[in-house]
């Protein structure tokens, strides 16, 4: 579900680039102009810009905003380590990057004329694949080839039964992460789009927008929390 008017689509039309719906997209160029792709670039540019500005203003003795954000980031990192253990500290940059990307993507669609990339299943599936694939990278990093024993069950003669169940379970993780995030953000986009269409950009959508601020944060938090738990499971099996 898209807002009635998307600014980037209008810009592309002015430049002579025709934006087609996902069903009509046939070429790679058509795919690159899809809203979930173009607004993903917007989110990435915003995050890169904020990161660059934050890096330039760093001081050895933190004060003001830097001090506040260092406390927040340290608290989040400590929370993650309480789940994954000290061995999982190295995955914090990935968790933080996924969390910031999902959070900003969730919030972007609340601005009239913009679209939430996470309201498209392709974006959420990509994030879920990163999380699940990296889970196995962690397992192999800590456990080597023996990590495959996790899929074989406690005794060898149960392998034909346990292995298919484990494989299905890991595929279900991708579906769970992607569909949960997509469904919640898409539902919010759907309601906002209807309210904007019926009542304009004024008071009617405000209650839903306040709810969207809360649910957008919760969905980003749940995605990161589940990813932490998957990473912790891979590290524990490595022990």
UniProtKB/Swiss-Prot annotation:
Q: Where is the signal peptide?
A: none
Put simply, this protein is called: ATP synthase subunit a
An annotated Gene Ontology molecular function: proton-transporting ATP synthase activity, rotational mechanism
Q: Which domain of life is it from?
A: Bacteria
Q: Which GO terms describe its biological process?
A: proton motive force-driven plasma membrane ATP synthesis
Q: List where the protein spans the membrane.
A: 31-51, 91-111, 125-145, 151-171, 194-214, 215-235
Q: Which UniProt keywords apply?
A: ATP synthesis, Cell inner membrane, Cell membrane, CF(0), Hydrogen ion transport, Ion transport, Membrane, Transmembrane, Transmembrane helix, Transport
Entry's localization field: Cell inner membrane
List, alphabetically, the GO terms of the cellular component aspect: plasma membrane; proton-transporting ATP synthase complex
The keyword Ion transport is annotated on this UniProt entry: yes
InterPro entries, per the entry: ATP_syn_F0_a_bact/chloroplast (IPR045082), ATP_synth_F0_asu (IPR000568), ATP_synth_F0_asu_AS (IPR023011), F0_ATP_A_sf (IPR035908)
User: Which HAMAP family has this protein been placed in?
Assistant: ATP_synth_a_bact
Subunit organization: F-type ATPases have 2 components, CF(1) - the catalytic core - and CF(0) - the membrane proton channel. CF(1) has five subunits: alpha(3), beta(3), gamma(1), delta(1), epsilon(1). CF(0) has three main subunits: a(1), b(2) and c(9-12). The alpha and beta chains form an alternating ring which encloses part of the gamma chain. CF(1) is attached to CF(0) by a central stalk formed by the gamma and epsilon chains, while a peripheral stalk is formed by the delta and b chains.
Give a short account of what the protein does: Key component of the proton channel; it plays a direct role in the translocation of protons across the membrane.
PANTHER family the UniProt entry points to: ATP SYNTHASE SUBUNIT A, CHLOROPLASTIC
UniProt membrane topology term: Multi-pass membrane protein
């Amino acid at each position: 579900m898209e807002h009635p008017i998307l600014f980037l689509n209008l810009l592309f039309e002015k430049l002579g680039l025709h934006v087609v719906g996902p069903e009509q997209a046939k070429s790679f160029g058509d795919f690159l102009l899809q809203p979930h792709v173009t607004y993903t670039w917007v989110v990435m540019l915003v995050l890169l810009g904020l990161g660059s500005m934050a890096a330039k203003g760093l001081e050895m003795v933190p004060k003001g905003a830097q001090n506040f954000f260092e406390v927040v980031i340290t608290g989040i990192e400590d929370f993650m380590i309480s789940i994954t253990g000290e061995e999982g500290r190295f995955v914090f940059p990935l968790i933080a990057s996924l969390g910031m990307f999902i959070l900003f993507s969730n919030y972007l669609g609340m601005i009239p004329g913009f679209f939430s990339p996470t309201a498209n299943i392709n974006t959420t599936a990509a994030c879920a694949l990163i999380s699940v694939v990296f889970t196995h990278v962690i397992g192999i990093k800590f456990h080597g080839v023996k990590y495959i024993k996790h899929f074989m069950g406690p005794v060898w003669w149960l392998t034909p039964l346990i292995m298919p169940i484990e494989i299905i379970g890991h595929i279900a993780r991708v579906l769970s992460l992607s569909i949960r995030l997509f469904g919640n953000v898409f539902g919010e986009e759907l309601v906002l789009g209807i309210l904007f269409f019926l009542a304009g950009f004024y008071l009617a959508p405000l209650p839903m927008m306040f709810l969207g601020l809360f649910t957008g944060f919760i969905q980003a938090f749940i995605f990161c929390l589940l990813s932490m738990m998957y990473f912790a499971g891979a590290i524990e099996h490595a022990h």
